Every structure is written in structure tokens, then in C-alpha cells.
UniProtKB/Swiss-Prot annotation:
Result when mutating residue 67 to A: Causes growth arrest of the procyclic form. Complete loss of catalytic activity
Protein name as it appears in the record: Terminal uridylyltransferase 7
Family membership noted in the UniProt record: Belongs to the DNA polymerase type-B-like family.
Consequence recorded when altering residue 345 to A: Complete loss of catalytic activity
Entry superkingdom: Eukaryota
Keyword entries, A-Z: Magnesium, Metal-binding, Mitochondrion, mRNA processing, Nucleotide-binding, Nucleotidyltransferase, Transferase, Transit peptide
Transit peptide: 1-15
Amino acid sequence: MNVAKREFIRGMMAHYRASLPPPEHSVVIHELQKRVLDIGMLAVNKAHVELFGSHVSGFCTPHSDADISLTYRNFSPWLQGMERVDEQNNKRMTRFGKEASAMGMEDVRYIRARIPVVQFTDGVTGIHCDVSIGNIGGVENSKILCAIRQVFPDFYGAYIHLVKAWGKAREVIAPERSTFNSFTVTTMALMVLQELGLLPVFSKPTGEFGELTVADAEMLLQEFKLPPIYDSLHDDDEKLGEAVFFCLQRFAEYYAKYDFSAGTVSLIHPRRHRTVYERVVRRHLELLGSRKRLEWEKHIAEHKEDGPLDENDFSASMQNETTQRPSNSPYVVEDFVNYVNCGRRVQASRVRHIQQEFNRLREMLIDKESELKFDEVFRESDTVPRFQGFEGVGTRDHRVKTFRPQ
């Protein structure tokens, strides 16, 4: 091993170790969750909050954003899109924002987007929080990612941490600049491990709508074994670092060459062709739509004041589902629990930048391995313009409501 590579591996493993949450982190996050529940109890009837995202998967740092799903008495994920239910949820989120501000949360704002969210900074920990109503998919995929990480926490953890650190430094992960979010790039990184035989392919989803379930993933992971050589990597950061570095090289090489115009990123079917993804989505939405209609009809039968069923509302609700699963966007990265295209928000104008960064990473990690410098690979860039929408300018947008302590 050349000197530059050895120093690079030391640097990346030190970076990973320094990013790990302290032993008491689970207590800190639990207390944060309790504070959010206290707010929820004031805002909705019989509130329940559930954490999801990186603090559940384990692919986090102490200061990672906290994603939280809020539900309430008689909540049903099937009714989103029904005008009266959406209006009530809007009132619930507005009350939640007011109560969050009153209880000491900072920079509180309610964004009434396709997926409404209340954002704030926790006054105790400084952790940024995103609270949405009934994010069932987010909760499920976080549990699956957690199960994946548990196979070998340091191996998967170091690899994903370094991919994300690179992505954030190089504006490949920057949703506020219309590039990827962390979950999307994590999925991309995991598909490379599947191609290397270092993670099973979740090819037999058994969900009611053709989706992968937590039980599906856990069953397959229980049977999965990494190659025997990986047993020697425990408690040896030099050997572990070499294995992680190899995977980083393959990640860079893979996506520098990958034909995104034809293929999708999928943990259910790696390199699935877009036309196949279209068929899968079509069938998924057929099943989803049938169940959704049944739930709407049931709700209206029990709540005459909300009826009759508005076909325009129902069509708009299903169109919203379709909009989240386009097959013609520059990138198609499948969310494995509901087939949402997580890469859909990347604008065509960002494709060149992203491809340049994959090429740069491949060149530095492979072509110029003997000249490796950790600081240069992870050097922060600031070349991609920020998205000037509600996430960029806040109070200028009518969809954003800010709250200040009374």
C-alpha cells in the first residue's frame, strides 16, 4: 500500500470515528422525542410521535436532523387528499407550530407543501427537526436501513458516512440546491454493495401493494453472511479502512459510468430498466388506488358531514401519488417501501454537476490513488445555486408560516 493511500485511509477512519454519536446519544434523542410529544399533546388529540431517518437507521452524527412522524386519534394515512381531512391537518400543523414556538423551539415554521411539515430547531440540543403527519413510509424504510446496518455496524456505517460526507461537501447531497437528499444517496451507495455481493438483493417483496416490508428485509438479512474475510475486520481499523476504501472506489467507478437515462437505482432489482419501473409503479398505484377508494368510502359512510365522495379530490390525490413516481426524471432512485422516485427533485440543470463530481471522485480514488489527499477529496465546494423557493427564502412564500414566541 502506498503512503498516500495509507494516510487517506487513516484520515477517513478518523473522520468516521469522530462523527459517531456518544454513548448517551440515545437518551438525548429520546428526550427530544418526549419534548416533541409534549408539543403534540397540546396540538392534536391523543398525539403519537415516531422518529425516523438517520437517528433510527444509525447512519447519523450527533447533530443530524431529526425526522418525526406525528399521528393522532383515528389517524388514517389513506385519507390524505380528502379536502376536509387536509383542512383539519392544516389546522393541526398550524397549532403544532404555535405550541412548538411557545415551548421554546427556535426558528419554527410551517411549510404547507405537498407533504406539509413543521420545521424548528430544538432549544435544548440545537438539532433541526422536521415534523410531518403520518410519514409511514419514512418510518418503515428507516427500520429497514437499521436492520441493514446491524449486520456489521462499523463496515456499513463507515462506508455510508463517508459517502454522505463526500456528497454534502461536494453539493451532490444538497436538496436546497436541487440535488440529492441523504436517503437517496444512501440507497445509491447500498446498491453498489449489492452488486459486490456485500448486501443481499431484496428481490421478493411481500407487501400488500408489492412493496418491501420490514419483515421481508429482516428475514433475508438473518440468512445473509458477509464473506469470511470480513470477520477479521472487527476491532482493526486499518483492515476495516481498506475494505471501506475499496467500496468507495467501486461507488465512484460505478456511478461515473452508470447510464441513469436507462436504468434505475433499486434495492429490490438493481439496475432495473425504467420501463420495468413504470410497470411496477402502474401496478402498485392500481392496488393503492383500490384500497384508497375503499377507505374513503368507509370514512364517508361513517362521517356523513364529509360526503359525498368528491371524485375530483380523489383524482387529485391519486395524481399526487403518480407525481411522486415519475420515470422520466433525470434520476430514478426507488424508495423500496413505496416505489416513490426519491431522485425526482433533481433538476436537469444539476445533472452535469453531479456527473462531474462522480468523475472527479473516480479520478481521485482510482486514477490518482498514489496522490490521494483526504482534505482534497472532501474539500467543500460552493458552485451550485440555491433553490429560491420556500426552502430558500422562507417568509416570502405564501406556503410558509413562521411562528414567534408570544
